[in-house]
Amino acid sequence: MSARNSDASDATLTHADASGAARMVDVGAKPATERRASAAGAIRMQPATLELIRANQLAKGDVLGVARIAGIMAAKRTSELVPLCHPIALTHVDVELVLDDALPGVRVTTSAATVAGTGVEMEAIVAATIALVTIYDMAKSADRAMVMEDVRVTAKSGGRSGDFVAPT
């Protein structure tokens, strides 16, 4: 994928009509093409909390396993959570969780794919966000000061707007 920077002066708001009212974009005439996107985020926590997750010693159980499933489930329900997002048939969703002692915390990366007339970025970022929220929920008994950070779309491909890779 190659990086593409959007020039704010060229940007148009596709989800607003001429009067500025929100509307759902009609993608019916757009060809179905392969679309892929990835997203990432992290949750920072106390080192002791990270150790509890690593040792699977939190009262709610397998934090990473539940967060992975929650992210996948969330991607499938994105159009119910984001008002103007089209429901699309996902062909793939992946949620990876990595324990990071240097953070300290958990880094989440997600990917999603579809063959559709609209992109899959929202599904990737919703998967990442809900995986992080689930980690918070499952570990809050040990650490209420956890902070979710740096949630973003990291890449997308397919569609008329071209490929995008977020700057590192």
Regions found by a protein language model. Name each.
Residues M1-L64, I69-H86, T91-T168:
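C-terminal binding/interaction regions
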